[in-house]
């Protein structure tokens, strides 16, 4: 049963009125509504997969959560949770998701994975091998999104009184490493809630392709970084902007709660519902 809990002492507090927009947003999302979505110019034929993790100090184990998106509007579904070392279950769910996608929309053009840490070669190989066995000859883009904000690099905008780079600013560190400034500074000075940028690493895997097609092009990198930026605006637990995309936030929230369930697994109802908001 979908529910929304409120501590009984909170409604009488003066500050409670400021929490109401967040509560209304979360309730609407939980019952299947769409508080807001991304405006897209063209329909994407991408399968987007988010993988986040949470380690419970009480339980002493790390769990990973996953979420799937079948469009570029930021509406996610098909959530699940696994043990940290159970990548085979994740690969199996990706295979099932691709099967449903093909039935509804035809063959995907790309698979994009937002991952909470650098994916090992043997782990990414399991995914690409699965695609090859299914007959897909499509590129796989792996976007490593560090949950910890990058503090080893500092950027300044000397034209801003607060020296904060404008939100959406991208700094290229190397061939495939970038900093994304994802704060609240737009055309006018705003509150600098997120002082440090998010560090991103991009990887393209395209088996059996021509050598030039295996290389990550800058236009592809920009599109992937723009997607990360936009998905950070799709957080429906609050009207406040986040610095991490929901491809990492939502699976992490699932991975934090599910280990406390009796069987440590997500029931069927919870796989298609934003109950965790």
Task: Identify the residue ranges that each predicted region occupies.
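Long, contiguous domain-sized segments
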Residues: 1-277
């Amino acid at each position: 049963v979908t529910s929304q809990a409120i501590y009984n002492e909170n409604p009488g507090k003066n500050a409670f009125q400021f929490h109401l927009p967040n509560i209304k947003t979360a309730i609407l999302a939980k019952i299947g509504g769409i508080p807001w979505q991304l405006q897209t110019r063209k329909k994407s034929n991408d399968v987007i997969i988010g993988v986040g993790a949470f380690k419970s100090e009480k339980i002493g184990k790390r769990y990973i959560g996953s979420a799937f998106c079948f469009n570029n509007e930021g509406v996610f579904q098909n959530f699940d949770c696994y043990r940290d070392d159970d990548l085979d279950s994740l690969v199996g769910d990706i295979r099932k998701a691709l099967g449903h996608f093909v039935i509804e929309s035809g063959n995907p053009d790309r698979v994009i994975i937002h991952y909470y840490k650098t994916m090992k070669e043997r782990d990414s190989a399991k995914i690409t091998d699965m695609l090859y066995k299914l007959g897909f000859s499509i590129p796989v883009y792996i976007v490593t999104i560090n949950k910890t904000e990058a503090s080893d690099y500092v950027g300044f905008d000397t034209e801003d009184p607060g020296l904060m780079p404008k939100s959406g600013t991208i700094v290229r560190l190397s061939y495939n490493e970038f900093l994304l400034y994802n704060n609240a500074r737009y055309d006018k000075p705003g509150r600098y809630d997120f002082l440090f940028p998010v560090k991103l690493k991009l990887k393209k895997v395209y088996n059996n392709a021509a050598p030039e097609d295996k290389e990550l092009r800058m236009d592809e990198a920009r599109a992937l970084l723009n997607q990360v930026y936009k998905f950070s605006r799709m957080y429906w637990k609050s009207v406040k902007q986040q610095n991490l995309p929901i491809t990492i936030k939502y699976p992490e929230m699932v991975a934090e709660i599910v280990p406390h369930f009796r069987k440590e697994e997500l029931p069927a109802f919870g796989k298609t519902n934003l109950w965790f908001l």
